[in-house]
């Protein structure tokens, strides 16, 4: 993974290793280096669709840098970390602001028309939703494990509400060429998990 960081910013290994350490925190089960690697694979495969592919890659690295399951402001804190870190590394204010904006966007995945950077980042972050059923089940189980301290009668309706908000987005995927196929599979996965969550109460 550090090689992927070096391709974006050679000479700043300490920052890359700090980010990987954050993604490797013991309370994480889904928001791990594997999630970051999958996002980067999607971004790399469709880099030509973004206005600034490296800004999208940097946003992927920072978007879950702060992850506290009980905090409502993880994306904002991750964006602040990105701003501080990139400014210290000598990035321009404009590019630093763009990366921070993209990190904040992952809070709700609300992408404005014409925002190619935001569209690619959001598609990469949500790509897991379009995975095959077995992989999706693993993702759902990993998310549940991150919230192991939350009782079922609280977790289930809360998780179902989050999934319903995603399922009701006018566009789940916005820019990847396979978005129609991804959307169909993602909606099927989401509806299946929602039914399981609400039916098991």
Model-inferred region functions:
Residues 22, 78-112:
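Histidine- and acidic-residue-rich, metal-dependent catalytic cores
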Residues 49-55, 72-74, 91-95:
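Short, flexible active-site-proximal loops enriched in glycine and acidic residues
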Residues 2, 6, 16-17, 40, ...:
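An amphipathic alpha-helix signature
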Residues 13-20, 33, 57, 96-104:
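Short, well-structured alpha-helical segments
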Residues 39, 54-69, 78, 101-107:
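His-Asp-centered metal-binding catalytic motifs of divalent-metal-dependent phosphohydrolases/nucleases
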Residues 25-35, 67-79, 93:
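Active-site metal-coordination segments of metallo-dependent hydrolases
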Residues 1-7, 24-31, 41-50, 62, ...:
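Divalent metal-dependent phosphate-bond-processing catalytic cores, especially two-metal-ion Mg2+/Mn2+ enzymes
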Residues 16, 36, 53-58, 99, ...:
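Short runs of predominantly hydrophobic/aromatic residues within well-ordered alpha helices
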């Amino acid at each position: 993974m550090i090689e992927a960081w070096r391709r974006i910013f050679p000479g700043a290994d300490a920052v890359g290793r700090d980010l990987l350490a954050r993604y490797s925190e013991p309370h994480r089960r889904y928001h791990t280096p594997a999630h970051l690697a999958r996002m980067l694979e999607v971004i790399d495969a469709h880099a030509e669709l973004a206005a600034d592919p490296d800004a999208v890659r940097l946003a992927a690295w920072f978007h879950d840098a702060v992850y506290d399951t009980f905090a409502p402001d993880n994306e904002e804190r991750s964006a602040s970390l990105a701003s501080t870190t990139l400014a210290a590394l000598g990035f321009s204010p404009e590019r630093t602001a763009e990366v921070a904006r993209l990190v904040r966007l992952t809070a709700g995945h609300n992408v404005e028309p014409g925002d190619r950077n935001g569209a690619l980042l959001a598609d990469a972050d949500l790509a897991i939703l379009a995975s095959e059923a077995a992989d999706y089940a693993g993702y759902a189980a990993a998310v549940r494990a991150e919230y192991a301290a939350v009782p079922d009668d609280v977790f289930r309706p809360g998780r179902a509400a989050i999934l319903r908000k995603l399922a009701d987005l006018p566009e789940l995927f916005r820019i990847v060429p396979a978005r129609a196929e991804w959307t169909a599979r993602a909606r099927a996965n989401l509806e299946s998990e929602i039914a399981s969550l609400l039916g098991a109460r």
